[in-house]
Amino acid sequence: MRTPASVREATRDLRLRLPVIVMDGAALYDMEKKRYLHACVLPRELALRCEAVFRVQGIHCFLNGVLDDNLMIYYGEFHHETERAIFEKLRTSPYRNYVSRSYYKDCPIVYLMGIDLTERMQALYDALGEAGLLEQVKVRFYPAAEYPGYSYLKIYERSASREAMLERLKQDLGMERSVVLTTQEGCGDVVIRGGANQAVKRLGRLFEPYLWEQK
């Protein structure tokens, strides 16, 4: 699921009125106020233990945290060109703050992310299991569509989920019912073909002007 930065970029022509669920359900972000309303933060010691497994496996780890309502992405020494390509593509965004790992101190970490050849990421996943960490966190391990042969592995706080954050949002807004738009079968109420950009357009046709104002 997208970060606030990628949501902003995908919906640049809209001014969303309602908070958005981001980071695979690990955070709730108010686009108008530019504030994180809720975040499922990884305990510091647990996050660093997971990072240590990345390091032992020779896989670079991006630490993604929230500090004073800013997305902070701590990075170390890149091990291959795919990591560098991602960094170069995203680092110019005004909504992302890339900082050298050597400056990391106490920023609350929302998730860890790595990308490498799929077989290496499988070895990382297995190593996390051997270290007894898989039972303590939520892991997403999936192919990188834009980089064939590579896969992502992301680690979140164990309770993080889109469903749980949606329930929290409904409580905050005093809502009883929600409609989930999705690009995948079986994952929501309304299936939209054509990816995230088509989802944004369909959302506009279905619910404007209830959810936002046109810029």
Where are these regions (language model features)?
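Active-site phosphate-binding/coordination module
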Residues: 1-84
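Short, polar loop motifs at secondary-structure junctions
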Residues: 2, 25, 143, 183-187
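Short, conserved active-site loop motifs that form the nucleotide-linked donor/cofactor pocket
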Residues: 18, 137-138, 189
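Short, charged, surface-exposed secondary-structure boundary motifs
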Residues: 29-33, 149-150, 199-206
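Phosphate- and divalent-cation-binding pockets in alpha/beta enzyme and binding domains
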Residues: 5-9, 123, 165, 202
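Conserved acidic, metal-coordinating active-site core of Asp-based
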Residues: 69-181
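Mg2+-dependent phosphoryl-transfer enzymes with acidic/Ser/Thr/Gly-rich catalytic loops
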Residues: 154-215
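Structural signal for conserved beta-strand scaffold positions within catalytic alpha/beta enzyme cores
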Residues: 22, 63, 141, 157, ...
